[in-house]
């Protein structure tokens, strides 16, 4: 793999992480609304925007979409968007941003381990130093979270924090499955670009979110003043545009430029940006442990890049 391709892939991976970090902040901005309502609002907006953007090319794309492609679009939309965000928003509101960022920070480890089994992937022993630094960085955040009590620092008490922790674990499993499946599907596609595939996932996600929206805005709806509704609409639209459309497009671009084992490391950028947004929201500087975590996570990504470059040089 050429160095220029690696740098482009890292750049798009960092942009995706910056955009996706916003999804951790959205539940804090809309605490008056449930995770189900936030998920429905975000993905209804995402589906609408995606439908408008894909409409001019839809007729040309339809002949290339068979039963397998539609089935993949449905399960990728469910796992990577609807199911993932219901659990993530629940985790943030119950357990706090720090705890949720910590658990989701294990994504690179999970994806990299799975990716190391693929054909042509680097063996796990060559990725061990990078993974060790990544785990050390996550451990720093864990120590900080446990020491400050943020694991139980949600709106409820310790009980809500435990529930939030398991919600974050469920989100981790959901998105790990999506990341691996989506990367492999992007590798198979010939006549459909990564951008169009992202928009198709958006359209399908919007349709699936209707099944969430009906009960979310009828059965469990509570009265809200008009100002809160406008705030909710603004946050939903903003997350749909920046995280779902822009972030996913950057991620799909990175997925085509980088091997699966390296894609797993790129998810670390989401953790870094989520922590950064959390500091800005809480109006404080990071602690020494948090700074150490950022340094370790960044070093983990750089070591992963180095491992792939060494493998490239040794193979030719």
Place the predicted regions along the sequence by residue.
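Loop-to-transmembrane-helix transition segments
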Residues: 8-16, 60-87, 163-171, 220, ...
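Helix-helix packing/entry segments at the starts of transmembrane helices
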Residues: 11, 17, 41, 81, ...
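Specific transmembrane alpha-helical segments of multi-pass solute transporters/efflux pumps
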Residues: 19-24, 55-104, 140, 240-258
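Transmembrane alpha-helices of multi-pass small-molecule transport proteins
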Residues: 32-83, 108-114, 173-181, 198-219
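C-terminal-most transmembrane helix of multi-pass membrane proteins
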Residues: 43, 143, 260, 264, ...
């Amino acid at each position: 793999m050429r160095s220029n391709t690696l740098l482009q892939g890292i750049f798009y991976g960092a942009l995706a992480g910056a955009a996706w970090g916003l999804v951790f902040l959205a539940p804090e901005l809309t605490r008056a609304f449930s995770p189900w309502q936030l998920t429905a609002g975000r993905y209804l907006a995402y589906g609408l925007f995606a439908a408008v953007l894909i409409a001019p090319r839809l007729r040309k794309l339809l002949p290339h979409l068979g039963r397998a492609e539609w089935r993949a679009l449905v399960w990728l939309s469910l796992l990577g968007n609807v199911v993932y965000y219901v659990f993530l928003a629940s985790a943030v509101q119950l357990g706090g941003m720090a705890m949720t960022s910590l658990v989701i920070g294990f994504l690179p480890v999970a994806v990299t381990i799975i990716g190391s089994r693929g054909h042509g992937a680097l063996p796990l022993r060559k990725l061990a130093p990078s993974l060790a630094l990544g785990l050390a960085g996550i451990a720093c955040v864990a120590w900080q979270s446990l020491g400050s009590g943020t694991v139980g620092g949600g709106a409820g008490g310790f009980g809500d924090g435990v529930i939030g922790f398991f919600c974050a674990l469920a989100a981790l499993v959901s998105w790990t499955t999506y990341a691996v499946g989506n990367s492999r599907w992007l590798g198979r596609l010939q006549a459909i670009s990564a951008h169009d595939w992202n928009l198709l996932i958006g359209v399908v996600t919007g349709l699936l979110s209707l099944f969430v929206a009906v009960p979310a805005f009828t059965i469990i709806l509570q009265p809200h003043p008009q100002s809160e509704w406008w705030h909710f609409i603004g946050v939903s639209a903003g997350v749909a545009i920046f995280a779902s459309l822009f972030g996913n497009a950057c991620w799909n671009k990175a997925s085509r430029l980088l091997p699966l084992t390296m894609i797993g490391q790129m998810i670390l950028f989401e953790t870094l940006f989520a922590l950064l947004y959390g500091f800005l929201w809480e109006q404080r500087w990071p602690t020494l442990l948090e700074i150490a975590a950022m340094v370790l996570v960044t070093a983990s990504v750089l070591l992963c890049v180095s491992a792939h470059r060494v493998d490239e040089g040794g193979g030719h």
